[in-house]
């Protein structure tokens, strides 16, 4: 029995060590190691491979508890409306001033503070624009119940309607991306300058020269962001991820819950 405990602890320590490396392959091995540790715990302590598999599968099936009991009941507005709003306090978003300075140091002009609220869900956007490169930037805060996180994004709008976005959103996105939206997801530990350089490389890779980008009126940017949010909801209604609830609300369908679960599995092994 002692040998079994030592083996389990050894595999766990090796797994945690793998997760500390920055290499994607080692990170994914570490994620598989979590499943292996759970399997060994069940198998070695009971002698049953079935219990071992049950312990390992708990990591994969546990999200369904939250999906069925909470997410399935959530509603969202069918048409999200951005409004001007004051920035959150330092106790809510202590990094906002520092991030703002970092964005402005790279040639961006602060355009507006906007956001939308729905029940326990709040989203705040600090919007910027750099006219010479026709690129908009945003510092975004998502606050839902007891969970809050922020991310940075850079977007360039092509004249053909395609939106090219580079961001460090920390999770797999909870909605299907609209067909006209091309996303380049990068690591969360990049500075804004590194994010900006990555966005430039993203545009260059796809042959998007500055003259192919739409030049925006700064005052129009909040309306464009609102338009993007509404387009996402409309696309996911059409895809069956969301379903209407009355005339003004939507919620996740069973297909949508399955989509969220698959997104969770992607996050389980993805380098973030």
Describe each region flagged by the PLM:
Residues 1, 22-24, 130, 140-142, ...:
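Alpha-helix initiation/capping motif
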Residues 1-81:
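N-terminal alpha-helical membrane-insertion module
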């Amino acid at each position: 029995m002692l040998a079994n405990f030592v083996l389990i602890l050894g595999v766990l320590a090796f797994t945690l060590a793998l997760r500390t490396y920055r290499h994607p392959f080692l990170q994914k091995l570490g994620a598989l190691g979590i499943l292996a540790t759970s399997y060994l715990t069940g198998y070695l302590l009971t002698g049953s491979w079935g219990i071992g598999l049950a312990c390992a599968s708990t990591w994969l099936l546990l999200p369904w508890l939250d999906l069925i009991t909470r997410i399935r009941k959530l509603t969202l507005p069918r048409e999200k409306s951005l409004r001007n709003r004051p920035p959150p306090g330092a106790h809510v978003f202590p990094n906002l001033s520092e991030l703002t300075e970092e964005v402005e140091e790279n040639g961006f002009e602060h355009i507006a503070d906007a956001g939308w609220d729905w029940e326990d869900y709040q989203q705040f956007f600090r919007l910027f624009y750099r006219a010479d490169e026709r690129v908009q930037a945003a510092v975004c805060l998502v606050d839902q119940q007891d969970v809050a996180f922020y991310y940075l994004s850079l977007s360039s709008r092509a004249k053909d309607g395609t939106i090219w976005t580079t961001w460090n959103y920390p999770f797999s996105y909870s909605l299907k991306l609209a067909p006209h939206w091309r996303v380049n997801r990068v690591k969360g530990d990049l500075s804004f300058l590194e994010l900006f350089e990555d966005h430039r490389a993203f545009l260059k890779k796809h042959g998007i020269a500055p003259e192919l980008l739409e030049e925006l009126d700064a005052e129009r940017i909040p309306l464009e962001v609102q338009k993007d949010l509404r387009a996402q909801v409309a696309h996911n209604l059409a895809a069956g991820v969301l379903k209407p609830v009355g005339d003004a609300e939507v919620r996740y369908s069973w297909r949508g819950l399955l989509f969220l679960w698959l997104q969770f599995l992607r996050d389980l092994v993805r380098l973030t």
